[in-house]
Structure formats: structure tokens, C-alpha cells
Amino acid sequence: MTSVFKTGGLRVEYDMKVPMRDGTRLSLDVYFPNSDGDDGPWPVILIRTPYNNQMPSVVTQSATFFAQHGFVVAAQDVRGRFDSEGEFTPWVNEYDDGFDTVEWIGSRDWCDGNIGMHGPSYVGNVQWQAASMGSKYL
């Protein structure tokens, strides 16, 4: 179930469930900019992490910063981690899951069709894996 929280002019929808091609659902928290009457669509920054999509130092601080500057930020727990379904096997599902997530976000009415990815370490590597799949939105 998705929950909505508003803080500092931002709206955050927690625990959206994004379906993967095999039916596994991955948890996505989405930070929306202060719209001031603008209902989007907006460019999106995607962060896919095995470290918890609500981790203050890597995810929530970055998400808040980018949302305050006009981006939607979508932070996802990778397969088998935290609120996402499935089994976590490092690197194995990141190509397909990254592509499926990008395609799902790209089809949302709040996305303007432009998606970038952000993050270091494992989070940075999954960007390359997703990008190699050739989504028109990246």
C-alpha cells in the first residue's frame, strides 16, 4: 500500500509497487517537487539501491535536494532488499529490473519522458546495467 507524506513543500509517495517482467514487485518511493500549481510532468532522477531507499545519507538527502530543484526523484529498493519482493542475488537481475523500472516510470503521467540515474558504488553500477538495455527514456 502506498502512503503519502508532505514535508517542506514536497510530496512523497512511499512504497509504490513496480511490476517486473516476471511478476516480482519492487518498492519505489517517489519525491515530487513543490508544484506551485504546476502538476508536471517533470524530468525524473532514478536511484536504485540495495542499501535501503530511505537511507538518509545517500537517498533521502539527494532526493530532497533534486525535488526542491524541479525533479521527481524515484528511489527503489532492488530485488530482494528491504520493501522489494524477490531474492537478492548481486548483479543478476539489475539489467532487466533496471530497464523495466525505467520503462514503468517513463510511462507515468508525472514523467516528461526524460530519466537520469544517480548514485555511487553499487548504485552507480546498476545505472550502467540499466542503460545498456537501450530504453528510450534514459
Descriptions of predicted regions:
Residues 23, 80, 119:
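Conserved G/P- and acidic residue-centered "switch" motifs that form tight phosphate/ATP-binding loops
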Residues 18, 76, 119:
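Conserved SAM-binding loop
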